[in-house]
Amino acid sequence: MWELVTLLGLILAYLFWPRQGSSGTKYPKSLPSLPVVGSLPFLPKSGHMHVNFFKLQKKYGPIYSFRLGSTTTVVIGHHQLARELLIKKGKEFSGRPLTTTVALLSDNGKGIAFADSSATWQLHRRLVLSSFSLFRDGEQKLENIICQELSALCDFLATCDGQVKDLSSSIFMTVVNIICMICFSVSYKEGDMELVTIRRFTTGFVNSLSDDNLVDIFPWLKIFPNKTLEMIRKYTEIRGAMLSKILKECKEKFRSDSVSNLIDLLIQAKVNENNNNSSLDQDSNLFSDKHILTTLGDIFGAGVETSSSVVLWVIAFLLHNPQVKKKIQEEIDHNVGFSRTPTFSDRNHLLMLEATIREVLRIRPVAPILIPHKANTDSSIGEFAIDKDTNVLVNLWALHHNEQEWDRPDQFMPERFLDPTGSQIIVPSSSYLPFGAGPRSCVGEALARQEIFLITAWLLQKFDLEVPEGGQLPSLEGIPKIVFLIDPFKVKITVRPAWKEAQAEGSA
C-alpha cells in the first residue's frame, strides 16, 4: 500500500514539479509553485486579471512566469519583448494551447482563432484575408456595405428623437449585418430569428469563456458536471445548427463563376480540394464542413462583440468628456458638412475623431490580454529561455498603461495622438498594439477600423448623445471577459438641428 502511495507521489512530482533547465540556462523569474496546483494559491484572487498581472510586473519584472497544473505560462508586459514574440519570432510562437474549453468551442482546434499553428490554419486564415478583396470595388465595396447598414441604423435612431435608449442592441445589429454580408451576403432586420440566434451564441460564448475555468488547469475535472462546459456545448450546438443551415443553402446555389463572399470562397476551396484529392475522409481534409463552420464561427466571435464594444466605449468616454465630443462634431461640420455622409477617406481630416478612437483602443483595449500563444519549439524572449509548449500571454494592458511610455496613462487624452499643431496623427509610443501583430494579428483589423470610424462619425454627425436628465455617467470600470466589455448604459438621443434642417431642405 505505502509503496503504491510513494509511487503515485513520485509520478505526480515528476509531472507537476517545475522543470530545471540545463546549467547556465536562464528562465524568467517565477511565482512560487507547489506540486499539482502550481502557482494557483499565489495568484491574486480578486480584481481584473490584466491589472493583477501588471501589478505582479513590479515585483517580478516585465517578463515572468507561473505554473498552473503541469503547464508553464510566461507573461510579457513590455513592448520590446512583445514585438520580439509577435513579430520577430512570430512563427516560433504562433501556436495555440488546446485547453478543454477551447477544444469544445473550436471542435478540437479547427478554425483560425484558436487553432494551433498548421497548414490548415494558415490556409483558412489566408482565405479569410483574401475574402476582403471581394469587397474592394463596385456595389460590393466594403465601405458601401458598412454605410448601407449605417443608413438603416440612423433612420431608426431618428425615430427615437428625444428618447433615452441603450444603444448596444442597435449597434450590435449593425455590426452583425456587416459581418453577415461579408460571410454570406445576407442582412437581417430587428426581430429576425437568425439575428436573435447570433446574439444568443455570441453573448453566450463571451460570458462562458471568461470564467476562471479550473477544468482548463486540471482537464480530468471534465468527468464531473461542469456548468461552463455545458454552456459552451449548448452555444456551440446553437451556432452549428444555424451556420450548417446557411452552408447547405449556399452549397445548393453555389456557382464557381460567381464567388461573392467568404462562404463561397470556402466552398470553392473545398470543391478544388475534392477534385484534386478525393480519397481524403470528410474530417481530415482541409475544408471539411466542420472546418468551414468553425472558421465562420470564429469570424462572428472575433468581429461582432469586438467592434460593437469599442463603439460603446467611444461613446462612453465622450459622455465623460463633452468638450472632446464638441471638437469632433465641429470637425465633422467643417470638413463634411450636412450635404453628405462621412466616408472613410474623411479620416485624413477628422483627426480628433481618429485620435479619440486610438486613445480608446489604448486605454480600454479590446482584449487586455491577447489570446494565449504557445511556443512551437525551444526558443527565447529577451535574455530568457522559453521551452517548447510553454504558453505565453501578452498583457496589452501593461503595454498601454506603462508610465515610462505614456504620460498619465490612466487619463483619457486623445490629443496624445496628435502633433503639437493638431494637424497630424502621430504614434507617440511603440508600446501600442491594439490589434496584436505578426502571424496571429487580428484578421479583421482593417474592417474593424473602418466600422468603428464610420459608425462613430455617422452618429456624431446626425445626433447629440447625452447623459439622460437625472441619469448617471457610464461606468468606465469595464467587464473583462474574452472581450473587454462596458457596463450597460443609456443615452438621450437628439437629432442635431443642423442635420434636421439639411434633410428638410434636401427633400423640399
Curated annotation (Swiss-Prot):
Chief subcellular location equals: endoplasmic reticulum
Q: Which domain of life is it from?
A: Eukaryota
Q: In which pathway does it act?
A: Steroid hormone biosynthesis; Steroid biosynthesis; glucocorticoid biosynthesis
Q: Where in the cell does this protein reside?
A: Endoplasmic reticulum membrane; Microsome membrane
Activity regulation comment: Regulated predominantly by intracellular cAMP levels. The 17,20-lyase activity is stimulated by cytochrome b5, which acts as an allosteric effector increasing the Vmax of the lyase activity.
Query: Which reaction(s) are listed as its catalytic activity?
Result: a C21-steroid + reduced [NADPH--hemoprotein reductase] + O2 = a 17alpha-hydroxy-C21-steroid + oxidized [NADPH--hemoprotein reductase] + H2O + H(+); progesterone + reduced [NADPH--hemoprotein reductase] + O2 = 17alpha-hydroxyprogesterone + oxidized [NADPH--hemoprotein reductase] + H2O + H(+); pregnenolone + reduced [NADPH--hemoprotein reductase] + O2 = 17alpha-hydroxypregnenolone + oxidized [NADPH--hemoprotein reductase] + H2O + H(+); 17alpha-hydroxyprogesterone + reduced [NADPH--hemoprotein reductase] + O2 = androst-4-ene-3,17-dione + acetate + oxidized [NADPH--hemoprotein reductase] + H2O + 2 H(+)
Record's family?
A: Belongs to the cytochrome P450 family.
Q: What does this protein do?
A: A cytochrome P450 monooxygenase involved in corticoid and androgen biosynthesis. Catalyzes 17-alpha hydroxylation of C21 steroids, which is common for both pathways. A second oxidative step, required only for androgen synthesis, involves an acyl-carbon cleavage. The 17-alpha hydroxy intermediates, as part of adrenal glucocorticoids biosynthesis pathway, are precursors of cortisol.
Tell me the protein's name. Answer: Steroid 17-alpha-hydroxylase/17,20 lyase
| Species of the source | Cavia porcellus
